[in-house]
Amino acid sequence: MNKVEIKRVLFVCVENSCRSQLAEAISNHLFSNHLKAFSAGSRPSGKVNPKAIASLKRIGIEHKGKSKSVDEIKGSDFDFVVGMGCGDECPNIPGSKRMEWNIPDPKKYGTKKFNETRDQIKKKIVSDLL
């Protein structure tokens, strides 16, 4: 029986409060047999957006993440670094395969947009990382 190699992935956005938090939680909850996910921001807000937490809860995911800086994860090794749409503000992490998903930030919108963003992220995880 072959052992599946668990890939380490870092999701990065500017504030580490919405998109990257959604991606981290979905990866670790639904795809933990394949991925170990982390998230960080180039300018973290200091808190996870409550609408992101509520969106995850609607699909049965309890998320207790915290908004953190990319400085807190420097020196860690990742197989993939995924920019969620932060452009030039996303850091370059040496030795990692870089992807840019360009997912719009839902923070100014309501429940429907957060759910759409969550579902879009889940589809990208399946298509690009598994």
PLM feature segments, named:
Residues N2-L130:
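Short polar/charged helix/loop
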